[in-house]
Amino acid sequence: MNIIFNACRYLCIALCLLLSSFLHSQMIDYQNLSLQQALEIGLKNNKNIQISHLKQEMSATKEKDLKMEKLPDIEFHTSYTQVTNLYQHQNGVFNKATKYDAINGMYDFTLSASIPVYMGGKIKNTEQKAAIDTEISALRTHLDERQLTMEIITAFLQIHHLKEQQSLINDKMKEDSVNIKQVKALKANGVVTVNEVLRTSLQLSNHKMSWTELDNDIQIAEHKLKTILSLPEDQEMHVNTEDLISDNAAIPYVDELTETALHKNESVEISHKNLSLKELDQKITKANYLPKITAGGEYFLKYPNMMFFPPEPYAYRLGMVGVNLTYPIESLYKNKYKMQEARENIDLAKLQIEENEEKIRHNVYEAYKKFEETDQKVKIAEESINQAKENYRIVRTKYANKLSLITELIDADNTYLEAESNLISVKINRQLKYYQLQYTIGNL
């Protein structure tokens, strides 16, 4: 009865877990996927992140395994041997041998144990190395997660840029349709020529072509994002890119950013931990000069009693406990260059720390200047769009009064469109540079 009850209980638990997983998947609106939802899905599904987490678990398992080295080795041994009688050639092998009856059956049951008492610090330092390797693995996992986050944000901003450009072209297409109607009306009244009708129609065709190209680019970008998120191929997905752009990004001084990066960037911490590993390697190599002490013992039951002579046909028991000391004399001459290599590895690790910190300082400075540059470009683009808008208004008024040609109106319209497109690009690029700066200093 209890077995049936337990089976039903486990079945209910499994169904509940399956249902909760199904409901969670239903809660995600893949037709209107937000950035936050995409980040959660990516950190959960992305294969590279899964590999990083698995490597981290493997490092932790290795660390636990090395701690077992301090425990005693226990071994049980048993054997049975059938022995013939002994023939001794007292007068040479070609003469008749003298026969001696031997105890024909031999067996033993042995239980032995040994434990390292002193190994020159090798076990302790190896454990510390494993612990540092686990910490490095965790740092690399966190770095991979940040890289994925930056990749997803970049994909969202790219899609947002394409959508904004498409929306701008869509507005221009509506405006083109209005212009065509007006020009056709003027043509009907004999005010303009057929050429002007064709030029306005050509403008609409060009904008339609641009809209189609942007639409395909959006689909490609969303498919790329779907690949990053490791979603099924048949899963339809569209992203919500609203509220991605902020004009209130406050950035502190570059010196403060550099200090933050030197404390938070994983590569800096990894390089310091790598130095610790090389120092531990030196200690492990130095341990080759030191003696090794182990303690152990064994207890056995054997037959026959070979401790006496002649052997007696009786089983006997015996226990032994002792300490074993070994000193590797060859290390006095074999370990010389290993120690030199260990010292050189430490010097190399120190140089790598300095090089890495210099690289971080430059990367922060570059990211900061690029953000400043986009900040200035936004102001310039805003001025340009005001000038282009005013120019378009003037030319349009002149064209309405037949004081300018259709080509001048189209040129002014294209200039205005280019200014609007450029403003969209620099604003989105400013947001991207802001995220890249945050990524460089380790905040993202």
Where does each model-flagged region fall?
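Sec/SRP-type N-terminal targeting helices
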Residues: 50-54, 67-68, 103, 117-145, ...
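Short segments within alpha-helical structural elements
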Residues: 206-231, 385-443
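Membrane-embedded beta-strand positions in outer-membrane beta-barrel channels/transporters
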Residues: 110-112, 156, 258, 322-324, ...
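Periplasmic alpha-helical coiled-coil/stalk elements that build and connect Gram-negative outer-membrane
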Residues: 2-3, 33, 37, 61-63, ...
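Bacterial Sec-pathway N-terminal export signals of envelope proteins
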Residues: 25-75, 79, 233, 239-276, ...
